[in-house]
Amino acid sequence: MNENVMVKGLTALTILTSLGFAENISNQPHSIAKAEKNVKEITDATKEPYNSVVAFVGGTGVVVGKNTIVTNKHIAKSNDIFKNRVSAHHSSKGKGGGNYDVKDIVEYPGKEDLAIVHVHETSTEGLNFNKNVSYTKFADGAKVKDRISVIGYPKGAQTKYKMFESTGTINHISGTFMEFDAYAQPGNSGSPVLNSKHELIGILYAGSGKDESEKNFGVYFTPQLKEFIQNNIEK
């Protein structure tokens, strides 16, 4: 991959405190720059597939099973995540699913930017994680020119952790690497890449630049990667 690839979300945009996740966000108005017509805000994330998407500080993740979230290694390892919380499908108007402390992290042993994050089942508000999220199903596969959507928290702190969905097309797949043109920004790292049936193809991990017209890259979930994830879902 080009050395100029920009990893999205390496720098945390806010620091969480013990008071919770969303409460620490600035009330000043913000907006996402250069957002095109294929980007929309999800104001109510209580329904599938949006209620499977979670916010980390500086990144995004997707729920795949009991207390189990998939994201990037660089998100899981950043900012001492054990001091932070995961916010389940936080959105600007809909009811969020709670804020959950991280229990442990399992990194994929290969080069792929993939990690499993397990959270404690009970939120700081007393909510049950598994009763407030949905589990995203894996796609059987994908091919070039398939339509996709990317759901996550671009510029999380600057947008007060509003959820956005962008759509695009797969341009290239090779092994565990995929390239697509759905719009993304810092904060979208770990965002689920879904097919038209809202099945999980992979997760976003990087982009080639700051302009929305440039390419974005994801970890494509091969059978081997799906097996790793499934073997690490809490029983």
Swiss-Prot record:
It is an enzyme of class 3 (hydrolase). It is found in: Secreted. PROSITE patterns: V8_HIS. The keyword Signal applies. Residues 1-35 form the signal peptide. The active site is at H74, D113, S189. GO terms for cellular component: extracellular region. GO terms for biological process: proteolysis. Gene3D superfamilies: Trypsin-like serine proteases. PANTHER family: PROTEASE DO-LIKE 5, CHLOROPLASTIC (PTHR43019:SF23), SERINE ENDOPROTEASE DEGS (PTHR43019). This is Serine protease SplA. It comes from Staphylococcus aureus (strain MSSA476).
